[in-house]
Amino acid sequence: MAVPARRTSKTRKRLRRTHYKLQVPGMSACPNCGELRKAHHVCPSCGYYGDKEVVKTK
């Protein structure tokens, strides 16, 4: 089995791990009602996706 020739320092290990983080989901304003919703998803408040009503809301 392959073994590293040198020990990885704490700094190098931590610098490599700086990119391991959670990403915030892309939010956009609904063109119909103006509420925030996830991009490319049906709006939970009005039920529209683009110009069409996909889900009936009360």
Swiss-Prot record:
Among PANTHER family, the record links this protein to: 50S RIBOSOMAL PROTEIN L32, LARGE RIBOSOMAL SUBUNIT PROTEIN BL32
Q: What is this protein called?
A: Large ribosomal subunit protein bL32
Q: Which SUPFAM superfamilies match?
A: Zn-binding ribosomal proteins
Q: Which InterPro entries match?
A: Ribosomal_bL32, Ribosomal_bL32_bact, Ribosomal_zn-bd
Question: Which GO terms fall under biological process for this protein?
Answer: translation
What family is this protein classified in? Belongs to the bacterial ribosomal protein bL32 family.
Q: Name one GO molecular function term.
A: structural constituent of ribosome
Q: Does the keyword Isomerase apply?
A: no
Which Cys residues form disulphide pairs?
none
| UniProt xrefs under HAMAP family | Ribosomal_bL32 (MF_00340)
Q: Which UniProt keywords apply?
A: Ribonucleoprotein, Ribosomal protein
> Record's Gene Ontology CC terms?
large ribosomal subunit
